[in-house]
């Protein structure tokens, strides 16, 4: 599990960048899933109604 400090206004792209900083996984290999939906880079956490303490799933796209 990776814990991140984020704001509701953060974009998915931004969250992926934070994951890269912590784990070294390039954003283009990350797919974030919440409530069964793949999250789009340009949207924000609040667009998806992702709240405090929510858990996202990270799926890696392998080359």
Swiss-Prot record:
PROSITE patterns: UBIQUITIN_1 (PS00299), UBIQUITIN_2 (PS50053). Residues 1-63 form the Ubiquitin-like domain. The record marks 57 as: Essential for function. One of its GO terms (cellular component) is cytoplasm. The record marks 43, 61 as: Interacts with activating enzyme. SUPFAM superfamilies: Ubiquitin-like. It is found in: Cytoplasm; Nucleus. Coiled coil: none annotated. InterPro entries: Ubiquitin-like_dom, Ubiquitin-like_domsf, Ubiquitin_CS, Ubiquitin_dom, Ubiquitin_ubiquitin-like. Belongs to the ubiquitin family. This is Ubiquitin. It comes from Lumbricus terrestris.
């Amino acid at each position: 599990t990776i814990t991140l400090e984020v704001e509701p206004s953060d974009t998915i792209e931004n969250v992926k960048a934070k994951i890269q900083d912590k784990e070294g996984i390039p954003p283009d290999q990350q797919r974030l899933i919440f409530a069964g939906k793949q999250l789009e880079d340009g949207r924000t956490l609040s667009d998806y109604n992702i709240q405090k303490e929510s858990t996202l799933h990270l799926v890696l796209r392998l080359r």
